[in-house]
Amino acid sequence: MLEYNLKPVSYTHLGCNWMALPGREYPLNDCVKINVAHIFDRCFHEVAYKESPSVQKLWDRFLCCLTEAVQVTAEGIAFHLEHMHKVFPELVGNLLMHNTIEQGLDVTQAAEFINIGVDGCGLAIAADSFAALEQRIEREGLLSWNQVTAAIDRNFSGPEHERVQLILKSSERYCQGASLGDKWADRINREFTRRVVRCV
């Protein structure tokens, strides 16, 4: 039989809480997500159908909605931490937490550190969409806002709208390397991160 003389904080335990400082931290990672593609879709429909739409107006509206999404998510996390012990107590033995049994507290109350991760999903879709609109409408003039909205309204059905879809899909995309899509992804990422950090 092996003997282990390690202090509780110097080893890790198995399970889904792989980011945890063993026995000391309450982690909630890979769970909380903000879908930036959905935010883009909402903002596109608010801006593109109005008079004189532009990528800048779309970006301004996107930032406003992104700020709201991050704020609402932060409020939800705070609510979760405040009420988790009442509705879904964490399994004390599984997490090997310190002071939960000794103090009669839930892990969300006894944890020395709280580590919450907020993921931004849908980045490629949002970045590619911004890039396609900027490149094909504003830089090259191959399409108009009216053509794009008409094609979307008809789910790109019919030869004319399929052409619009192909033009948009062949624009500079995310992960092509130094592309317009990459630049938009970086821009969205920076703004997303800035807002999440501000809510901490």
Where are the regions that the model predicts?
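Conserved catalytic cores of very large enzyme subunits
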Residues: 1-200
